[in-house]
Amino acid sequence: MKFAKKYEKYMKGMDEELPGVGLKRLKKLLKKCRSDLQSHENDGSSAGRCPGHCSVCDGSFFPSLLNEMSAVVGCFNEKAKKLLELHLASGFKKYTMWFTSKGHKSHGALIQQGKDLVTYAIINAVAMRKILKKYDKIHYSKQGQEFKAQAQSLHIEILQSPWLCELMAFYMNLRRSKKNNGAMELFGDCSLVFDDDKPTISCNLFDSMRVDISLTCSICLDTVFDPVALSCGHIYCYLCSCSAASVTIVDGLKSAERKSKCPLCRQAGVFPNAVHLDELNMLLSYSCPEYWEKRIQMERVERVRLAKEHWESQCRAFLGM
């Protein structure tokens, strides 16, 4: 079965109607564009690239795909956030959320919803990449790849959503087994693995895409601790991200300047809306308890030192010293 049919069958089989990529409609647009290109060839026009004023490329295909992916990512982020809030809530708040949330009251329902959301995210990411690949093939261009890069900067690349990593960790936390902490399966093809003490969440789906999320901080080169995901999708330790943003742990990342850039992709303005990955933090703490305990002790000392330096500087500034 071709991917387009698999995708259509999957979207129709969902319990509720969610935004998706209109593969059939986009393919029709590309088919029309292919006919236009062939007519240009027959007329003797240059055929090595997409025409400069192609109505399909400039006015229909990319704007349509942009709107659809924005809707998919927005829906995914919203649902993932609600599900994770329900799981992480405590006390009276948790009781209230469980009481008011329909269909989420059983442990099994939470597991299934987490699995469904991860699948929804990845299959839509596959759909976008396949239609962009088809676009480039028809037009002999790299505009599809350029659009994919632009999607990352616009935060509509769903595989870079911090909520995807959190959902995977959430699912593994619910299914955690004390007998096998080395490689905890997600749903057959997804797991947390350690290669030379370097943790990675890996996921295969539909035999066409592999998602690997490195859990090594690129600043301290160690396993991420108290991890945060920036708006661009890159994951760092909280202390490392504060250092990169030139802010104190007291002020936090929300106080970072808009011109501060991600150390990896150099995208600006990605610190203020950083997401704390609490589920991932829990998963790693259970997976490597000895390392985690040592790191907690080190972090506690470092945070006390940084907080002390901050308040001492504030006192000196207040006293005019």
From Swiss-Prot:
Keywords: Metal-binding, Transferase, Ubl conjugation pathway, Zinc, Zinc-finger. One of its GO terms (molecular function) is zinc ion binding. GO terms for biological process: protein ubiquitination. Pathway: Protein modification; protein ubiquitination. The keyword DNA-binding does not apply. A zinc finger (RING-type) spans 217-266. Its EC number is 2.3.2.27. It catalyses: S-ubiquitinyl-[E2 ubiquitin-conjugating enzyme]-L-cysteine + [acceptor protein]-L-lysine = [E2 ubiquitin-conjugating enzyme]-L-cysteine + N(6)-ubiquitinyl-[acceptor protein]-L-lysine. Residues 1-149 form the SPX domain. It is an enzyme of class 2 (transferase). It holds the Pfam family zf-RING_UBOX. Coiled coil: none annotated. The RING-type zinc finger domain mediates binding to an E2 ubiquitin-conjugating enzyme. Belongs to the RING-type zinc finger family. This is Probable E3 ubiquitin-protein ligase BAH1-like 1. It comes from Oryza sativa subsp. indica.
